[in-house]
Amino acid sequence: MLIVKRFILWVLLFFMAITQLLLYLPDFSCSISTGLPLCTPQFNVNIVTGSRTTKDFVSSVRQFLRLISYLAIDMGWSKYLADPHIYNEENLVDTFDTDNLFKINYFGFCKKTSGKTKYCVANGDCGMDVLGILVRDVGLQLGRLTQRYENNTRILGDSLVFTYHLGLSSMRKFLRNDNYRNNAFSKLLLATDDQPYSNTRIKNYAKGVTVAYTLVVVNKIMFYMHLAEITISAAFVVAVLGFGFVLIFGKHHTIMPLLLKGWGSVLMVSSTSSYLATIVYLGTLKLLEPTEMLDTQSQVAGHVLNNDTHSNNWDLLQTTVGSGFVISCFRYIVQCLMLPLVFIAANRYTKAKDFLPAGTEELIKV
């Protein structure tokens, strides 16, 4: 009976520890298409063209993707070369179509079109980098068009992502160095008859490159932070199990309660950092959304949207919170409630002399 009472608090702690660990499982969804392709995304993203800059950009990218799709077919890369329907619009690379929905998680993403999931794939250590995901989607679709990579489309997807990262780094260095030359080369590439508008375009494209590069770096950091958090969570469960094992041999201990408090504190710091980083990242993606209120006010006031300063922003994405983020919030609440229980259990089963100041034990004996 005494042993049963001893384990009541530990059972509650173990239940909460296992619960918070199991709540990490949805983070691994959205990464495979085989079997049952479950997906509980942190957020959902679709392409929008809310400004003149993004309209020009998306239109140019669509034309380029159409060109390389035709190129892949005409050069005999496609096994469907004899099929005349291969040239239909729905068979070409459609990454930047506005009816696509990308469901993004920590370790992978799913692409959904017209309400149907087309595929789910792992995203490596790129994490939730939205622009990198769009590049990977281009590679995956080209891989399906080409006969050489039809059985392993990820090869071309990985290659394009690697090329994208290299190109982004090179473009960032180019724009940074060109800034010291008064944007001489940038003006040659992006110049128009309207010189003030040309300078604005240069600044906007430089801003776009900076945002894209920042997304790459931040998401790599967030990926490894989250991986470390899951590892710490598993280690904490092991510590709880070890704590329960030593309780069999006695009620009061020294080392295991300290380990329990240590792992619990580290887990809380790690989960808080990861949780806040995800919130900040979602907030950053919200900045890439079009501000419909400003657009409406401009139209009501009789202004032409193309002449508005807001129309030059990178309003490229529309982001909504996914079910995976809701699960993450619930997991974080469980961890916050679990931390006080960790310290209560550890202090309850710690040897009494560990709490006494030096010399107190001798006074008690006297």
From Swiss-Prot:
Cytoplasmic side: 1-6, 251-261, 346-366
Presence of the UniProt keyword Metal-binding in the record: no
Chief localisation class: membrane
Localisation: Prospore membrane
Keywords: Membrane, Sporulation, Transmembrane, Transmembrane helix
Membrane topology designation: Multi-pass membrane protein
Lumenal domain ranges by topology: 28-229, 283-324
Membrane spanning residue stretches: 7-27, 230-250, 262-282, 325-345
UniProt keyword Transmembrane present: yes
GO cellular component annotations of the record: cytoplasm; prospore membrane
GO biological process terms, semicolon-separated: spore membrane bending pathway
Described function: Involved in spore and ascus formation. Required for the efficient assembly of the precursors of the prospore membrane to a continuous prospore membrane.
Entry's family note: Belongs to the SMA2 family.
UniProt name for this protein: Spore membrane assembly protein 2
The encoding gene: SMA2
